[in-house]
From Swiss-Prot:
This is Receptor-type tyrosine-protein phosphatase mu. The modification Phosphoserine is found at residue 821. Changing residue 299 to A: Abolishes dimerization. It comes from the Eukaryota. Residues 1-20 form the signal peptide. It comes from Homo sapiens. It catalyses: O-phospho-L-tyrosyl-[protein] + H2O = L-tyrosyl-[protein] + phosphate.
Length: 1452
């Protein structure tokens, strides 16, 4: 039977071959197997044998018959292998591999395992696709291989036998590659590669042609990966089905090659290999970066350029949640930055970025989280329901409705109890912090109050962002014991027996005074005989009475008065004072005018009796002799009752006195009555008791005097009289009077009176004149104000376009600050929209505008002969209103600036007037350029020298100013041979200002010769001495003293040298040039001669300066500008003024900036009042002037274009930028010089000018971990001596600590060595020594880092103005001490933006104050923003600049 089958099979094979339906690769093994391309593996344990029983019969019953390939397993150990390799096949058409196999065993146990492999494209062997290992059948069986690998793939079929250790045979025969599908095994169509994201199911769809029945096995076979089971079969027709396989929960290890397999009863079908690609969803490597913080928002940079996982990124999401909460939110993001809104204030959030790649499950896990906190928000409202709980005399207790976070909107807040009350007429304001805020019934007790005082109380809820107040509550404290009556207020008017006592109520009444209690007591007396025991008592007075009269007191007695005041609460402390009654005169005994005891012609003897004391003992007794004269009347006698003034007898005649003291003796010498003789010619206590004259009548008086407490009281009594014995007169020589002395005295008195009278009249007259002058000045000022206002009204009524122009100027010109200076006045002229006045200066008939201008501006210019009218405004190029200037320039710049190009090309180019003098051979060497020379009609003519007619030539032309003929001289930069002529011109023209708009050398070419000395230089007969040099960032001001031989005059001449014009083109911005123009205007004397303006040729830059200067005047006076006709007029005076179209456009931009920004400088004396006014809120616009100023600043800040930052945007530099939207422009980049391997020379930093030094600051971001090395290269390369750090170290924000705390850090060739550190308030200062190890010959540099701690991340401005000013001063001091101010300062914050800009701006403002005593915050910030637009990017930071300026002024 086997032979028959073999014959039939051979016949069928021949028929198929004849029919062309078989392919190479088949083999019947009739010939050697190698002829079929079969081979065996060299590394096998044994080989297959080719057997042909027809040629070599066998008697072994277990061996099959025929020709075939055989493996004899008998005697072979288990596990040995033998491989039979078919040739490689590359078949694209549907085909089938058919083969027969035979298995027999001598022990009924399988002799081994027969496997079939299909290896594709010389790839790995993989797992068997077919095998037979069952019981031996001892018959030939047929199997099919339906292989679908498809072109251009190729494959190789391999038969493998693995012995089992049992005896038997395994054979294969009749391997055929048929050109038609297998009949019993389905064929797979091509399966496709599958790409999935990790963690997802990978589904392979295997379409097959054929039938499948129950019992067929389908699976997905992988190479070096796990197999996948069948998911489902979908039969689509009787001859087609689709099998689905899932590789579940895929990981990177599941990636590889898979093919579909089906095992049927007739064989096996295999598909081509398909690739399973497993992509890892992307995850950011770094957390997002915080760009800015608000109360309800966080602005972040995604920072997702570096990822783990696979791209591409098709979606970005931001996931955020509170740090302590369980909820989270996720928002899609379509840009590199995102603002998370609707957040809670003062809440910590965790923010992560999720990235998504294509496909299901393509969203990666959240990246590292940024943990940050929102700012506090302004409290929602103030505390409510404030009420009084308890009132005492010195304290009150209040309570209020409790509140929580929803009201405070900040976890860090203060509840301040603000209260005020009056004490002693002064308002006392106090604040206390209440800590009882968490209680359900919060209350606060205010202590140390004054009793019976109205206390105004309110609660202030404050957090870092704002404050809200409660309603005010007024409560009166309870009464208390009053204070003491002021001791100094207790005043007593003393009499001999009375004291009138007065006092004031207590300073601290502490209630209503209802009663005063006065206790008095005698404490001492001058009279020791007085009994004081009964001299005391108590008196009460009502509260409205503060005086009392005490009478019945003893003279000369000291009384103590004690006063207490009482309120309803009781008496307060006592106040005591003492007063002494006045002493009384002694009481003289009674004397009758009795006959004296004895009397002679020259004496009288009387009886003297002791007097009685009253309040003070008698001190002395005196005898007074009074001469009776006929003219003496009784009235006179009554007036001179006693004699307080002692007069010696010797002086009585000289003083023309009627009396004299004859004797004085102490009181203790007269204890009892005793006689005394008047005229006994003796001396008593210095008084001569001279004998009486017989011919005169006398009255004899006895008086007693008591002296105590600085007063003297006298009483006297007449004790005797003596009549004249003989009335005949006797001459008295001693009574002769010097009449000359008396007359002289009278005359002197009269003269003194006259002098005093005249002085009084003169003073009164002077005061009257001063008052009249003041009234006159006030009247004059009022008249001037009315005049100017009426002029404004008259022009406004005419409805001209100037009103709109000045409306624009008022809106945008910051000169509206009410800074009083002459230039702040603006004059309006009556102009039409199509024309401007005929000339820049008036003719003789032009009166009102010029006269008024002269009045307001107070300028006087040197009178010159009128020149030709400068120009007539053309109809095609009318003047432009200032209000329309922005729109005009925008239109002109359309279509690549076609409007400007057309206008500029319409100017006449080249010579337009004769220049014969300049062309003379004698003058050719005086011209720097042959085509820029002086026209004859407008050239400056010098005085000839020694008859040389050509010596009057200099290459310079007169140019008319605005309403000022020949106001400028445009000239070339002096050459070596024309320096003397230049100074001759300056002297001859009485010039006070020279404007130089070039550098001496540019691009290696000499543009101008240095025509000024560094000390003193003599140019023939002119001596020039340099007095002062003032260096500023963009210009230099030099002051010279100039003398001319033979002229006794020294002139002060200033040279304004603008150094900021670049070598090519025009300045990038006009800010510096506009400031330069204003300096020239402010420092040029109005009475001096023309301004001499020169560059190199005296045409291009010179023309720019002159046009800008003229147009600024025109814009201010008329509200219009006429740049086109101004340039045209300039060109009629000097060839090719404004040489390039670029310069022409720059002039327009400069004028626009000047009109928008205005002059914003403020004198130091006016800063405080101005800043106060700037912060006032306009109720109509709900805005303030400072907000408008900041808005204007934002409007004029230039926007960086992509081409401006081309270097920062290079792919190799991306990773060096913290934020891709905060980049330095190419023009101010500091390129790194120190070589460090292959590292680039780029760093995210920008050079910034200070007030006096160009490129004094380098503003940069906080170094990233990968740019720390570049940071120190920057410090070393650019000679930086200070580093200012305005942010915190925060590794989460990629802000590492970039300096060593001790020892040495090495960053490539640069070594940074720690030297010292110091902490002072909010500033940590560290000193480092840095050097380049690769260039030891360069030495080292000391660098001080100033880390400012007073600017928390959540605040827009520093906490303290004083601390920040101290930081500025410390940096300035270090810079000046270490390097003489020549070193640069590196300033950095997180991103090199707002904080760094604030530091630089304030530093500039402080320099302004130090050198110019002016403040110009707008100009300082505008200058910084010209290079980096994000400098000082918040209104609060802008205000802070003003506030630190005020702090600077306050600190002196």
């Amino acid at each position: 039977m086997r032979g028959l089958g073999t014959c039939l099979a051979t016949l069928a094979g021949l028929l198929l071959t004849a029919a062309g339906e078989t392919f190479s690769g088949g083999c019947l093994f009739d010939e050697p197997y190698s002829t079929c391309g079969y081979s065996q593996s060299e590394g096998d344990d044994f080989n297959w044998e080719q057997v042909n029983t027809l040629t070599k019969p066998t008697s072994d019953p277990w061996m099959p018959s025929g020709s075939f390939m055989l493996v004899n397993a008998s005697g072979r150990p288990e596990g040995q292998r033998a491989h039979l390799l078919l040739p490689q096949l590359k078949e694209n058409d549907t085909h089938c591999i058919d083969f027969h196999y035979f298995v027999s065993s001598k022990s009924n146990s399988p002799p081994g395992l027969l496997n079939v492999y299909v290896k594709v494209n010389n790839g790995p062997l993989g797992n068997p696709i077919w095998n037979i290992s069952g019981d031996p059948t001892r018959t030939w069986n047929r199997a099919e291989l339906a292989i679908s690998t498809f072109w251009p793939n190729f494959y190789q079929v391999i038969f493998e036998v693995i012995t089992s250790g049992h005896q038997g045979y395994l054979a294969i025969d009749e391997v055929k590659v048929l050109g038609h599908p297998c009949t019993r095994t389905p064929h797979f169509l091509r399966i496709q590669n599958v790409e999935v994201n990790a963690g997802q199911f990978a589904t392979f769809q295997c379409s097959a042609i054929g039938r499948t029945v129950a019992g067929d096995r389908l699976w997905l076979q992988g190479i070096d990966v796990r197999d996948a089971p069948l998911k489902e079969i979908k039969v689509t027709s009787s001859r087609r089905f689709i099998a689905s396989f899932n590789v579940v929960n895929t990981t990177k290890r599941d990636a590889g090659k898979y093919r579909c397999m089906i095992r049927t009863e007739g064989g096996v079908g295999i598909s081509n290999y398909a690739e399973l690609v497993v992509k890892e969803p992307p995850v950011p490597i770094a957390p997002p970066q915080l760009a800015s913080v608000g109360a309800t928002y966080l602005w972040i940079q995604l920072n997702a350029n570096s990822i783990n996982g696979d791209g591409p990124i098709v979606a970005r999401e931001v996931e955020y949640c509170t740090a302590s909460g369980s909820w989270n939110d996720r928002q899609p993001v379509d840009s590199t930055s995102y603002k998370i809104g609707h957040l809670d204030p003062d809440t910590e959030y965790e923010i992560s970025v999720l990235l998504t790649r294509p496909g299901e499950g393509g969203t990666g896990s959240p990246g590292p989280a940024l943990r940050t906190r929102t700012k506090c928000a302004d409290p929602m409202r103030g505390p409510r329901k404030l009420e009084v709980v308890e009132v005492k005399s010195r304290q009150i207790t209040i309570r209020w409705e409790p509140f929580g976070y929803n009201v405070t909107r900040c976890h860090s807040y203060n509840l301040t109890v603000h209260y005020c009350y009056q004490v002693g007429g002064q308002e006392q304001v106090r604040e206390e912090v209440s800590w009882d805020t968490e209680n359900s019934h919060p209350q606060h007790t205010i202590t140390n109050l004054s009793p019976y005082t109205n206390v105004s109380v309110k609660l202030i809820l404050m957090n870092p962002e704002g404050r809200k107040e409660s309603q005010e509550l007024i409560v009166q404290t309870d009464e208390d014991l009053p204070g003491a009556v002021p001791t100094e207020s207790i005043q007593g008017s003393t009499f001999e027996e009375k004291i009138f006592l007065q006092w004031r109520e207590p300073t601290q009444t502490y209630g209503v005074i209802t009663l005063y209690e006065i206790t008095y007591k005698a404490v001492s007396s001058f009279d020791p005989e007085i009994d004081l025991s009964n001299q005391s008592g108590r008196v009460s007075k009502l509260g409205n009475e503060t005086h009392f009269l005490f009478f019945g007191l003893y003279p000369g007695t000291t009384y103590s008065f004690t006063i207490r005041a009482s309120t309803a609460k009781g008496f307060g402390p006592p106040a005591t004072n003492q007063f002494t009654t006045k002493i009384s005169a002694p009481s003289m005994p009674a004397y009758e005018l009795e006959t004296p005891l004895n009397q002679t012609d020259n004496t009288v003897t009387v009886m003297l009796k002791p007097a009685h004391s009253r309040g003070a003992p008698v001190s002395v007794y005196q005898i007074v002799v009074e001469e009776e004269r006929p003219r003496r009347t009784k009235k006179t006698t009554e007036i001179l009752k006693c004699y307080p003034v002692p007069i010696h007898f010797q002086n009585a005649s000289l003083l023309n006195s009627q009396y004299y003291f004859a004797a004085e003796f102490p009181a203790d010498s007269l204890q009892a009555a005793q006689p005394f003789t008047i005229g006994d010619n003796k001396t008593y206590n210095g008084y001569w008791n001279t004998p009486l004259l017989p011919y005169k009548s006398y009255r004899i008086y006895f008086q007693a005097a008591s002296r105590a407490n600085g007063e003297t009281k006298i009483d006297c009594v007449q004790v005797a009289t003596k009549g004249a014995a003989t009335p005949k007169p006797v001459p008295e020589p001693e009574k002769q009077t010097d009449h000359t002395v008396k007359i002289a005295g009278v005359i002197a008195g009269i003269l003194l009176f006259v002098i005093i009278f005249l002085g009084v009249v003169l003073v009164m007259k002077k005061r009257k004149l001063a008052k009249k002058r003041k009234e006159t000045m006030s009247s004059t000022r009022q008249e001037m104000t009315v005049m100017v206002n009426s002029m404004d009204k008259s022009y406004a009524e005419q409805g001209t376009n100037c009103d709109e122009a000045f409306s624009f100027m008022d809106t945008h010109n910051l000169n509206g600050r009410s800074v009083s200076s002459p230039s702040s006045f603006t004059m309006k002229t009556n102009t039409l929209s199509t024309s401007v006045p005929n000339s820049y200066y008036p003719d003789e008939t032009h009166t009102m505008a010029s006269d008024t201008s002269s009045l307001v501006q107070s300028h006087t210019y040197k009178k010159r002969e009128p020149a030709d009218v400068p120009y007539q405004t053309g109809q095609l190029h009318p003047a432009i209103r200032v209000a329309d200037l922005l729109q005009h320039i925008t239109q002109m710049k359309c279509a690549e600036g076609y409007g400007f190009k057309e206008e500029y090309e319409s100017f006449f180019e080249g010579q337009s007037a004769p220049w014969d003098s300049a062309k003379k051979d004698e003058n050719r060497m005086k011209n720097r350029y042959g085509n820029i020379i002086a026209y004859d009609h407008s050239r400056v003519r010098l005085q000839t020298i020694e008859g040389d007619t050509n010596s009057d030539y200099i290459n310079g032309n007169y140019i008319d100013g605005y309403h000022r003929p020949n106001h400028y001289i445009a000239t070339q930069g002096p050459m070596q041979e024309t320096i003397y002529d230049f100074w001759r011109m300056v002297w001859h023209e009485n010039t006070a200002s020279i404007i130089m708009v070039t550098n001496l050398v540019e691009v290696g070419r000499v543009k101008c010769c240095k025509y000024w000395p560094d000390d003193t230089e003599i140019y023939k007969d002119i001596k020039v001495t340099l007095i002062e040099t003032e260096l500023l960032a963009e210009y230099v001001i030099r002051t010279f003293a100039v003398e001319k031989r033979g002229v006794h005059e020294i002139r002060e001449i200033r040279q304004f040298h603008f150094t900021g014009w670049p070598d090519h083109g025009v300045p990038y911005h006009a800010t510096g040039l506009l400031g330069f123009v204003r300096q020239v205007k402010s420092k040029s004397p109005p009475s001096a001669g023309p301004l001499v303006v020169h560059c190199s040729a005296g045409a291009g830059r010179t023309g720019c300066f002159i046009v800008i200067d003229i147009m600024l005047d025109m814009a201010e006076r008329e509200g219009v500008v006429d740049i086109y006709n101004c340039v045209r007029e300039l060109r009629s005076r000097r060839v090719n003024m404004v040489q390039t179209e670029e310069q022409y456009v720059f002039i327009h931009d400069a004028i626009l900036e000047a009109c928008l920004c205005g002059d914003t400088s403020v004198p130091a004396s006016q800063v405080r009042s101005l800043y106060y006014d700037m912060n006032k809120l306009d109720p109509q616009t709900n805005s303030s002037q400072i907000k408008e100023e900041f808005r204007t600043l934002n409007m004029v800040t230039p926007t960086l274009r992509v081409e401006d930052c081309s270097i920062a945007l290079l792919p190799r530099n991306h990773e060096k930028n913290r934020c891709m939207d905060i980049l330095p422009p190419d023009r101010c980049l500091p390129f790194l010089i120190t070589i460090d391997g292959e590292s680039s020379n780029y760093i995210n930093a920008a050079l910034m000018d200070s007030y006096k030094q160009p490129s004094a600051f380098i503003v940069t971001q906080h170094p990233l971990p990968n740019t720390v090395k570049d940071f120190w290269r920057l410090v070393l390369d650019y000679h930086c001596t200070s580093v200012v750090m305005l942010n915190d170290v925060d590794p989460a924000q990629l802000c590492p600590q970039y300096w060593p705390e001790n020892g040495v850090h090495r960053h490539g060739p640069i070594q940074v060595e720690f030297v010292s550190a110091d902490l002072e308030e909010d500033i940590i200062s560290r000193i480092f020594r840095i050097y380049n190890a690769a260039r030891p010959q360069d030495g080292y540099r000391m660098v001080q880092q100033f880390q400012f701690l007073g600017w928390p991340m959540y605040r827009d401005t520093p906490v303290s103005k004083r601390s920040f000013l101290k930081l500025i001063r410390q940096v300035d001091k270090w810079q000046e001490e270490y390097n003489g101010g020549e070193g640069r300062t590196v300033v950095h914050c997180l991103n090199g933006g707002g904080r760094s800009g604030t530091f630089c701006a304030i530093s500039i403002v402080c320099e302004m104050l130090r050198h110019q005593r002016t403040v110009d915050v707008f100009h300082a910030v505008k200058t910084l923003r010209n290079n980096k637009p994000n400098m000082v990017d918040l209104l609060d930071q802008y205000k802070f600049c003003y506030e630190v300026a005020l702090e600077y002024l306050n600190s002196g």
